[in-house]
Structure formats: C-alpha cells, structure tokens
From Swiss-Prot:
Bilayer-spanning residue ranges: 5-25
UniProt name for this protein: CDP-diacylglycerol pyrophosphatase
Organism: Salmonella typhi
NCBIfam families for the chain: cdh, PRK05471.1-5, PRK05471.1-6
Catalytic class of the enzyme: hydrolase
Cellular compartment(s): Cell inner membrane
Length: 251
C-alpha cells in the first residue's frame, strides 16, 4: 500500500508539472518584452509617443501598458530585461520599487473607467515563475475579487506586521500576509521584504507570487504564496483579481 501511495503521489506531481509547463509555454513568452523594448521604448525615445503603451518613463525605468484582458487592467513593466520574481535585480537597492510605482499608476484605471475607482477596489499582483505566461516582469494593476475583498476586510485586525499565514487561506491556497504602512511600501520593495523576512525565501524567490491590497484603515496588506504542485498551486497571485471588475458594479 505504501509503494502504491508513493507511486500515485509521483504521478500527481508529474501530471501537475506537465500541466503547468504546457500552460506556461503554449504561447510566446517574450511577447510583452518585445512590446516594451521594440515598440514602446523606441517610439517614446524617437518620437515622444509611448504607443502602444499608455506611458513610458525611460529615466524611471518602467512603462504602463493596457492589457487586452479586462476593460480596466493595466500592466507595469520595466524598460530593461527582468524576467520575473526570480531575478536577483529585484533585491538590488538601485532597482526601482516597482510595486510602489504600480500603485501610483492606478489612476489609469479610473481614467479608463470614466469615474474615480476607490483604492479598496484596486489590487496589484505578480505571478511566480511557473505561474506566469510571460518572461518579462509585469505587475497586474486590476480590480480585486469581491470575495477576496470581503475576506481581507474581515481579517483586518488579524493581519500582523510580520509575515504570518493568512487565516482561512485564499482561493484554496496558502498565503502569507503582512501589514505595512503607506510609508513603508513607498520606501521598501515588497520583494525585499519577502526575501529578507521569510526564511529561505531569498534563495527561492521564483517560487513566490506577490500581491498588494489597500485596507480600510489606509494600511496595505502584502500577500505571498509559494508554488506547491501537490496542492496544484502554481503561485499565481493574479487569482485574487477580477479583470471584469464586478466589484465596481456592486458599489
């Protein structure tokens, strides 16, 4: 029985890994990088036109791009080569605080929507190495799922200033949660907080996905989930988002 159990476990892991691999490589993983480096950046530098991006900031090192999925979803991407959460560059002090820059760009959602979107409806997310389809770092700026919003509201007083397991998980997956102030988020990258504060995370950053959500007390919640093929968790923090923005119709 024990051998049979181990065999079944191995089969599950292999099937899960194969499924993730197919999902990841079934498209062009360099599509976003090509848009940034071959179109948006050259057009901005040569013609002062960011198209097809919404904004290009060469000196600050990032672009804002309207994603085709969802009416209000935008992406923040670097203007140079960074693959994703596994990149050592994200732990360098000179690297821009991409999450903070993404939060500052949330106004594009309101502009596209035609009305002010409350901060409580906005979320930021980046997927892990196996949880993404593109090999150019991109932070999703989009609406939060209404059920995730409700859960985080209910857990407001239970979320610590240290990385601790989020009560009840999220979307059936285990998450770590940490509360930070706006000042902390502005001054220190969530990538660094994860690498420096969660044991062994620094050596395995590519396994992690991260998300940032504003709370009703004006603090922020950092969320991190680690890849776990046994639980079919490919670490895609984008799962907390709803690109159809149903939360706006309920307000």
């Amino acid at each position: 029985m024990k051998k049979t159990g181990y065999f079944l476990l191995a089969v599950i892991v292999i099937v899960a890994a194969a499924g993730v691999g197919y999902w990841k490589f079934s498209g062009n993983p360099d599509a976003l990088r090509e848009i940034v480096l071959e179109r948006c950046l050259p057009d901005q530098l040569q013609h002062q036109n960011p198209a097809p991006c919404a904004e290009v900031k060469p000196r600050a090192g990032y672009v804002i791009f309207k994603d085709r999925h969802g009416p209000l979803q935008y992406l923040l991407m670097p203007t140079y080569r960074i693959n994703g959460t596994e990149s050592p560059l994200l732990l360098e002090p000179a690297t821009p605080n991409f999450f903070w820059l993404a939060w500052q760009a949330r106004g594009y959602m309101s502009k596209k929507y035609g009305h002010d979107i409350p901060d409580s409806a906005v979320s930021l997310a980046i997927n892990s190495r196996l949880g993404r389809s593109q090999d150019h770092l991109h932070i999703h700026i989009s609406c939060i799922r209404p059920d995730v919003r409700e859960q985080l509201d209910n857990d407001l007083t239970r979320i610590s200033t240290r990385w601790l397991p989020l009560p009840g998980d999220l979307m059936g997956h285990e998450y770590l949660a940490r509360r930070v102030t706006e000042s902390e988020l502005a001054q220190r990258s969530p990538f660094m907080m994860l690498a420096e504060e969660v044991p062994e995370a620094r050596d395995h950053m590519g396994r992690y996905a991260l998300a940032v959500v504003r709370q009703s007390d004006d603090s922020f919640v950092l969320l991190a989930t680690e890849r776990n093929l046994l639980t079919l968790n490919r670490a895609s923090a984008e799962e907390i988002q709803d690109h159809s923005c149903a939360i706006l119709s309920s307000r």
